[in-house]
Amino acid sequence: VQAMTYFARALGAARSGNPEAAKPDIAKLNELRDKLRDAKDAYWSGQVDIQAQVASAWILSAEGKQDEALKAMSAAADAEDKTEKHPVTPGVPKPARELYGEMLLQSGMPGEALAAFEATLKKEPNRLGTYMCAAKAAEKSGDNAKARDYYEKIVAMTDGAYQTRTAMRAHS
């Protein structure tokens, strides 16, 4: 639980353009990872390590080191892809592969971003946010048919829900 708090704060600070504010929380994540490793808890130490990797990648991005950030984020996503979810825990709030896709999209690489979002959906199906990102990436890469398919899936997933998202209404 502590790790999730530090991760959320670090990621939020880095993505808000305040990398210095993220660094103490990443230090705390590394400290927690080491304690878990010392306690021989390989699963949770690995999960916390991935969180630290993700947040560190976003710090690099916030510092304008985009190539390094993309490499670091790709490595974090690969590490998360190799782990299995613990049977008694919920999935991660936002998969590393999805965050990698967001970084790719932000870096002007919509085709690569789309591939990352599609990989996320294979492992973590029916994620509304991932569908939204995939639709945007498809649109930006010029694949309007695929974008429309994704927007239609979003509308179907949210059928009957109060629709306040203008992006979804614009494509339905």
Where are these predicted regions, by residue range?
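TPR/TPR-like (Sel1-like) alpha-helical repeat modules
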Residues: 26-31, 74-78, 138-162
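"A position-specific structural signal for the A-helix of alpha-solenoid helical repeats
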Residues: 4-8, 48-51, 55, 62, ...
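Boundary/linker segments of alpha-helical solenoid repeat arrays
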Residues: 1, 33-41, 80-88, 125-129, ...
